[in-house]
Amino acid sequence: TGVLERVDARRAVLACGHSARDTFAVVHGAGVAMEQKPFSVGVRIEHDQGAVNRAQYGDAAAHPALGAADYKLAVHLPDGRSAYTFCMCPGGEVVCAASEEGGVVVNGMSRFARDGANANAALLVGVGPEDFGSDHPLAGVERAAFEAARSAGGEAYQAPAQTVGDFLAGRASAAGASVRPTYARGVAWCDLRACLPGFVADALAEALPLLDRRLRGFADAGAVMTGVETRSSSPVRIVRDDALQARVEGAPDDAPESGLYPCGEGAGYAGGIMSAACDGLRVARALASAFEPR
């Protein structure tokens, strides 16, 4: 709305989402202690849902009692990295998850019936602090991927995409695929290596054939990868003390309490809906106990 309002409070819960980079910057600028944490970067991969059904159900794939099949895959690579699928959406679609103007970040969802033509899932590679290139809490590996995706996407909010076959062959995609992308804003065919950190792209290329052994057709040449997926968890953690309150950078142990309670995914203490809810309960109890008579 553009309306700014100041509300004074002795205590406040900071439960921002894991995409709230502007909030992270404000909190860091106020002197609150923050640290890097591992997170993941990758793409959304789409397959024909019928092919996934056949791979999972075999001859029973057409049985009316069976719904759209799902999967959960992971592989440990020789260099110590891992690649895995996350938030698999049977009969779903790839959606825009931008949280700022002009942003290009993707996520996935399924409607209640799960009856869409495609299956999709995040295909991710773990990223650790050693990959950041800086010890600054907002070092920005995910930001670099975000900016590259915005550049490669072309038109406003279009997402970069590539077929699995072209990605593994090391060539840019220039036309459509046998699997039609569901991203509503449209895709710009390209080479996704231009949008991803090199080690992420290399890990995906190594992982795809291995994951295909676990789910036949996973590395099908006509499958589509749409970028970038960086929203599986927060890249930072706001440091909390034993009372679950934020700490001011460099403050002594006997410093006055801050009254600020970082909570949930954005604060770096959860990695999904259920774990965020559990952390919310912890923070609510800590906040309530602060008002109990001493």
Where is each model-derived feature located?
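Residues forming the flavin
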Residues: 1-294
